[in-house]
Amino acid sequence: MTVKTRFAPSPTGFLHVGGARTALYSWLFAKHMGGEFVLRIEDTDLERSTQEAIDAILEGMEWLGMDWDEGPYYQTKRFDRYNQLVDQLLAEDKAYKCYCPKALLDELREEQMAAGVKPRYDANHPKIVAANAAATEDSAFCIRFRNPKEGTVVFEDKVRGRIEIANSELDDLIIRRTDGSPTYNFCVVIDDWDMGITQVVRGEDHINNTPRQINIYKAIGAPVPEFAHCAMILGDDGAKLSKRHGAVSVMQYRDEGYLPQALLNYLIRLGWSHGDQEIFSMEEMINLFSLESISKSASAFNTDKLLWLNNHYIKTAEPEYVAKYLQWHLEQKEIDTANGPKITDVIGLVGERCNTLIELADQSRYFYQDFSEFEAGAAKKHLRPVAKDALALVLSKVEALEEWNTENLHVVIADTCTELEVGMGKVGMPLRVAVTGQGQSPSVDATMMLIGKERVVNRITMALAFIAEREANA
């Protein structure tokens, strides 16, 4: 039997970290087992579902690199199938029409809560019996599933072990609303059956739905899949994860300069582990992942840890991989890389100093864009009259260079220090500010090499003019 998992988000909001982790676990298990991964959009909530949210979910999945083998399927395009199964259950007396008005149900719910009783639908309540008896052909009705009254529902959760619920704890679930639309708990069963889903991986907030859904599987004669319910993700303060903890949409992490691999590596560790290992390649994730290794305990979201992972991948990933995602940030900042060094060379030089791709894009700017002003603090400290001789000598030497490479530029700087009998800082720091416009950069010789001879000459010339003007105004 082919293993088949699915990710089935509701498009009532963007793809957030909790949903992304669920998708990742489902995707990894399918890949690990040589199976298939299905993407399904559960858009039966017609009032809250939006095309914007659907687009954001698809974009987030694509950005993370979680490709799907089937789909995306849309529940709103399967209403005929759901109605077919509702009619079948009605014909088999496994479902029935309920004419009880919402106002009465709300009233009874309030009475139960006031009495400290778990709110649930009671088909035998006198008021409900009376409401159904008073119905006419024109009365509005919903369809309820006739849940078994005796026995228990038992299933072996792949994360939590054996779970057992008495049927007496479950009420008769609405499977079709008064407006004719099917409900979540019914649709998900039909979809998972039709799509051949063998393992359902989802959040622990769905545990209460599972016994209800299992009874529907049995009523329609469908095989029951295995279930794995993952613990919640909490903030680092133990509270429910929210925006202040970093619970933002996946695409916001892209916008803030995170690499997909860093986020995936972080998400897999939020509830799963393999010894003390922290860094996992995609191949390792797929080979090592198992549902049984998912923790039963809630995980705490730590933005600092995610940032550390992002820095790790910027430093160690193949420059071509980083460049693929850096390019988007460069374009957002209107940095044209057509006239300048290869992006991969810049990443190799600057990447180690950056925690995010935004920082990397900012640190890459001076390789591609000229500037008209120097960073004020750096210029005040280093572009002083005392630096004039060093910059002038470097300028004459670089203009005379026939081969533009890091080694020759290193010799230029070293020879300048020797001839002027000054330390490296007296030459290197003014030169760094001159060619980059700022006080911090990687090694100045390697930086100059990538900036290119023409730009270096022009910028040192501009720095000398800045010093001359400063001297004149002193």
Curated annotation (Swiss-Prot):
NCBIfam families from the UniProt entry: gltX_bact (TIGR00464)
Entry-linked CDD domains: GluRS_core
GO biological process: glutamyl-tRNA aminoacylation
Gene Ontology cellular component terms for the protein in this record: cytosol
Class of the enzyme per the UniProt entry, highest EC level: ligase
Motif ('HIGH' region): 9-19
Subunit structure: Monomer.
Protein name: Glutamate--tRNA ligase
